[in-house]
């Protein structure tokens, strides 16, 4: 079983879902970031609970070489959309998509199937295959 699969099992045992795992560098420090979601939302207690369960696993199976900090958090209101499951769970939300050619499009994600998303824009619906997207995120309007 891969490290990601083991982390996913831990997250799900706590009533949450694994949204993403990434390793980032912030001000010279390496951060192993585990992002989770839950139907009732993610609070600090849930993050601490999951962090405390994942930490011993990472002590035995380090995710990166060298020093790192483990961070467990929610993806936030405005979240990156990378995986097909991210798009599937964001249907009905407003998103901003940057295509491979640099064009940026905003609209409501009305459908996602066969690795193609449909955005309802002010100029009508637009279909965009995932392989034409370099960056996508949800947008929260205050």
From Swiss-Prot:
Pfam families: DUF150_C, RimP_N
Cited InterPro entries: Ribosome_maturation_RimP (IPR003728), RimP_C (IPR028998), RimP_C_sf (IPR036847), RimP_N (IPR028989), RimP_N_sf (IPR035956)
GO biological process, alphabetically ordered: ribosomal small subunit assembly; translation
Cellular component per GO, a single term: cytosol
The keyword Cytoplasm appears for this protein: yes
Homology family: Belongs to the RimP family.
UniProt-recorded name of the protein: Ribosome maturation factor RimP
Source organism per UniProt: Nitratiruptor sp. (strain SB155-2)
Gene this chain is encoded by: rimP
